[in-house]
């Protein structure tokens, strides 16, 4: 049975979602989970784009062993050199080079002729092949490229050494039949097509990314590029979880197999949602809260009599289970460690001791500690970048029906260890906190979105707050986790500000980090 490779671009195209700025530790946490999920290739970033991206790709390449790590590069020597330096220590290094091929891109963006684009693509594939054992080449905006020209350039880059050809629907324009026809045309009109795998990369601007990806598979694609939860630029990418489950559930139709470990899907989805701050819609296929809910009386009656009447996939298939194991104040170190292992975390004894101490402190405040609580506890500690920005120390809020809400905050500037204390009022408690924080950090911050989410039912549940803000005109997303919703609100605001400061720091080092060649 033909195997479909999954090329995950959550950390590259997915991170290009507005307001998403992941630090290196967050990217590494997602990469490790993608490895457990069974992704064949992880596109870890665009090494030439910034110092931060370069370092993140390098760290991921050095850490991941069971799948291939790749980086994006333009058909430019400087990009390829940066990608090699970032990826060369990886277990299975490969590169993803691209250049636009549609006439609209050639005329308005590249200012190049078709002949010049072919020459550049062939030359840079050869250059990349001198370093990388596997070179993937992409025809940006392939969906609006005339098919005879697309076939011509595909043939020539395969001759130059490309062993994977990606034909993206960059703007999410085509219908499934049209997109599938591109792959059929390449199979029938490129003489050396047997020397390369065909890859599909679909955007969801018209809501057809998953359908188009499946159409590509029907017409000969061997690789699908996708992102967890379908995140990405504009309306996003094809959702990894939807494609994987569709191919599994309808194996009778598609006659293909994948290496995806399906019961890791829900855990992966939750991790990406938490770290990016992008909530999963309740009605989202496969991983939404309502994916396995039945409201209609007729549906409920049929489901209770026989699940298969209205349920084509089981929750357990994708890792959703109702049997939640809870820990408490009497749980020992061994049970704690076993639970972390079951959740996919691997720590040394020193880290286990640190997290166990934090766990015990938490049990003094909460009677039952769920998996969600453990994940929140570890992510908050493990993936926080503590070198740049501000550290939350303490918060006091005075509020009553006849009082003006007043917040007092203490922060530490992590670059110079300066203690900062301020107080301010507001129309409500959250506004008072945010007014105080704006005074503390001396930045122009505008709140765009504010959302509260609970880990579970119960009065002692953790609150998770997600915010989107403009920091000096640049959008950033942040999350905060705490038992107290006001503390979580303060942490979310600070997290968003810190992400933007990290991003600015990474970009400031770009010029000294890599030179763009030709």
Curated annotation (Swiss-Prot):
**Segments traversing the membrane:** none
MF terms from GO for this chain are:
2-isopropylmalate synthase activity; acetyl-CoA C-acetyltransferase activity; manganese ion binding
What sequence ranges are listed for the domain Pyruvate carboxyltransferase? 4-266
Q: Which cysteines are joined by disulfide bonds?
A: none
What catalytic activity does the UniProt entry give for this protein? Answer: 3-methyl-2-oxobutanoate + acetyl-CoA + H2O = (2S)-2-isopropylmalate + CoA + H(+)
Chief location:
cytoplasm
The subcellular localization recorded is:
Cytoplasm
Entry annotated with the keyword DNA repair: no
Taken from the record, one Pfam family name reads LeuA_dimer
What's the Enzyme Commission number for this chain? Answer: 2.3.3.13
Q: What is this protein called?
A: 2-isopropylmalate synthase
Q: Which SUPFAM superfamilies match?
A: 2-isopropylmalate synthase LeuA, allosteric (dimerisation) domain, Aldolase
Q: What are the alphabetically sorted keywords of the record?
A: Amino-acid biosynthesis, Branched-chain amino acid biosynthesis, Cytoplasm, Leucine biosynthesis, Manganese, Metal-binding, Transferase
What role does it play? Catalyzes the condensation of the acetyl group of acetyl-CoA with 3-methyl-2-oxobutanoate (2-ketoisovalerate) to form 3-carboxy-3-hydroxy-4-methylpentanoate (2-isopropylmalate).
Q: Where is this region: Regulatory domain?
A: 391-518
Q: Which organism is it from?
A: Bacillus subtilis (strain 168)
Identify the metabolic or biological route this protein is part of: Amino-acid biosynthesis; L-leucine biosynthesis; L-leucine from 3-methyl-2-oxobutanoate: step 1/4
Which PANTHER family does this UniProt record tie to the protein? 2-ISOPROPYLMALATE SYNTHASE 1, CHLOROPLASTIC-RELATED (PTHR10277:SF9), HOMOCITRATE SYNTHASE-RELATED (PTHR10277)
Output the Gene Ontology cellular-component terms: cytoplasm
* Similarity comment: family membership: Belongs to the alpha-IPM synthase/homocitrate synthase family. LeuA type 1 subfamily.
Q: Which SMART domains match?
A: LeuA_dimer
HAMAP family according to UniProt: LeuA_type1
Q: What class of enzyme is it?
A: transferase
Tell me, how does this one assemble?
Homodimer.
Q: Which BP terms does GO give this entry?
A: L-leucine biosynthetic process
């Amino acid at each position: 049975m033909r195997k479909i490779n999954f090329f995950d671009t959550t950390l590259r195209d997915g991170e290009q979602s507005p307001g998403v700025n992941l630090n290196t530790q967050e990217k590494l946490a997602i990469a490790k989970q993608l490895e457990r999920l069974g992704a064949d290739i992880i596109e870890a970033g665009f090494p030439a784009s910034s110092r931060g991206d370069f370092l993140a790709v390098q760290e991921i390449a050095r850490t991941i062993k069971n799948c291939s790590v790749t980086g994006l590069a333009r058909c430019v020597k400087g990009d390829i050199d940066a990608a090699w330096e970032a990826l060369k220590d990886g277990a299975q290094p490969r590169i993803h080079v691209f250049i636009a091929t549609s006439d609209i891109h050639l005329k308005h963006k590249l200012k190049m002729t078709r002949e010049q684009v072919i020459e550049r693509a062939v030359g840079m594939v050869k250059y990349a092949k001198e370093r990388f054992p596997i070179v993937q080449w992409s025809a940006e905006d392939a969906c609006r490229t005339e098919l005879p020209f697309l076939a011509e350039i595909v043939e020539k880059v395969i001759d130059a050494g490309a062993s994977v050809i990606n034909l993206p629907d960059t703007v999410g324009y085509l219908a499934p039949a049209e997109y599938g026809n591109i792959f059929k045309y390449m199979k029938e009109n490129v003489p050396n097509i047997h020397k390369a795998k065909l890859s599909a990369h679909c955007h969801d601007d018209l809501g057809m990314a998953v359908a188009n990806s499946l159409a590509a598979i029907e017409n000969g694609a061997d690789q699908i590029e996708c992102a967890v939860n379908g995140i990405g630029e504009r309306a996003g990418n094809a959702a990894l979880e939807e494609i994987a489950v569709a191919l599994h559930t309808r194996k009778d139709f598609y006659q293909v197999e994948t290496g995806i470990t399906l019961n890791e899907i829900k855990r992966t989805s939750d991790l990406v949602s938490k770290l990016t701050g992008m909530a999963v819609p309740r009605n989202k296929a496969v991983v939404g809260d309502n994916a396995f809910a039945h409201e209609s009386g007729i549906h409920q009656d049929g489901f209770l009599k026989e699940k298969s009447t209205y349920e084509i996939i089981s929750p357990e298939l994708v890792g959703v289970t109702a049997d939640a194991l809870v820990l408490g104040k009497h749980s020992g170190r061994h049970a704690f460690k076993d639970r972390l292992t079951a959740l996919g975390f691997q720590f040394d004894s020193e880290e286990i001791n640190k997290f166990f101490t934090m766990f015990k402190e938490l049990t003094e405040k909460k009677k039952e500690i769920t998996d969600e609580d453990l994940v929140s506890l570890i992510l908050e500690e493990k993936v926080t970048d503590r070198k740049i920005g501000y550290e939350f120390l303490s918060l006091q809020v005075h509020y009553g029906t006849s009082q003006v809400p007043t917040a007092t905050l203490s922060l530490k500037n992590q670059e110079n260890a300066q203690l900062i204390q301020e107080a301010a009022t507001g129309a409500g408690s959250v506004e008072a906190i945010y007014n105080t924080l704006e005074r503390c950090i001396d930045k122009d911050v505008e709140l765009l979105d504010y959302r509260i989410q609970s880990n579970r039912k119960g009065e002692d549940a953790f609150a998770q707050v997600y915010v989107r803000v403009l920091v000096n005109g640049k959008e950033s997303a942040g999350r905060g986790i705490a038992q107290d919703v006001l503390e979580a609100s303060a942490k979310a605001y600070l997290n968003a500000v810190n992400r933007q400061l990290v991003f600015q720091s990474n970009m400031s080092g770009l010029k000294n980090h890599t030179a763009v060649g030709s």
